[in-house]
Amino acid sequence: MAVRKPPITTREYWAPGHAACAGCGCATALRLATKAFSEAMEEKYGDPNAFAIAQATGCMEVVSAVFPYTAWKVPWVHVAFENAAAAASGIEAAWKKKGIKGKILAIGGDGGTADIGLQALSGMLERGHNVVYLMYDNEAYMNTGIQRSSSTPYGAWTTTSPPGKYSIGEDRPKKWVALIAAAHMIPYVATASIGNPFDFVKKVKKAAKVDGPAFVQVHCTCPTGWRTPLEKGIEIARLAIETGMWPLFEIENGDIWHIKIQPPGGGAKVYKEGGRVVRIEFKKPIEEYLKYQGRFKHLFKRPEAIDELRNQIKAMWKVLGVEAILPKPEE
């Protein structure tokens, strides 16, 4: 009888028993990422354990390493909110000096990456360190009290962007750090989502195998900060892809003229010219994604705000070289 090989290694580097919230999408992301990293190290260096982690303060640090306990089954160091990339750079330099084969994984949330740690990240990428930076993006400072970050989407409620008579909630467009990383002309940049775990695993493995720096921005649901049902995390993340809210793409060697766009699914029609995706007609409206989330519920009383969000998404896709057709619910 044939035995089917598991789609990913059964080795575990993120142990159960950590303190993450029930339904935490970021915990899922880190478990998958470390598995994928292990596979890449085994394929490249013959050693599945040939990696170490430098992790910034944030949700996943706090829930995984409350002294004297840890959920990590790999060499791991907790560093400050702003310097995961800098610490990873130092570890990588030490490994190079000592002749240690392997790769360093730096991990930070959207606050520690898009805001506080952006300078350190830029320096790491520009210097060409052999490090993969994984940004888990749950779109706010969830660990410290659900405060807005520059990665918070337009219109979202947070404790520092509360909607009201004179406020729509978050009033700035989302910052796409992946595009900033690509501007450094590094070997590999990608966006991913727990809503498409196989794509995520493939991209982490690809990032881990390149020589030089790589950056992966993964979209993670947060039931606590997003006010969503615990059991719908993967479904909601998938809806972000299928409605156009979260694009899946790859940029290699800073070549923004040849961005590789992954099809969103959900019945969307994808049109190509010369092998490049140039137009996507989405079937599902963004309201399908918004309706499950308490952080967006006030927008349904302000349809003009949803239209503004829709326009911002179209503008983001235009930057990627794609004309996005986003339907309204009645269409």
Curated annotation (Swiss-Prot):
Disulphide bridges, residue numbers: none
Cofactor annotation remark: Binds 1 [4Fe-4S] cluster per subunit.
GO molecular function, one term: pyruvate synthase activity
Catalyzed chemical reaction(s): 2 oxidized [2Fe-2S]-[ferredoxin] + pyruvate + CoA = 2 reduced [2Fe-2S]-[ferredoxin] + acetyl-CoA + CO2 + H(+)
Keywords of this entry: 4Fe-4S, Iron, Iron-sulfur, Metal-binding, Oxidoreductase
Record keyword Oxidoreductase present: yes
Gene3D superfamilies: 3.40.50.970
Entry-linked InterPro entries: PorB-like (IPR051479), THDP-binding (IPR029061), TPP_enzyme_TPP-bd (IPR011766)
Enzyme class: oxidoreductase
Binding site residues for [4Fe-4S] cluster: C21, C24, C59, C222
Cofactor(s) the record lists: [4Fe-4S] cluster
EC number(s) per entry: 1.2.7.1
Pfam families per record: TPP_enzyme_C
NCBIfam families noted in UniProt: PRK11865.1 (NF008819)
Assembly: Heterotetramer of one alpha, one beta, one delta and one gamma chain.
PANTHER family for the chain: PYRUVATE SYNTHASE SUBUNIT PORB (PTHR42897:SF2)
Protein name: Pyruvate synthase subunit PorB
Species name: Pyrococcus abyssi (strain GE5 / Orsay)
Gene this protein is translated from: porB
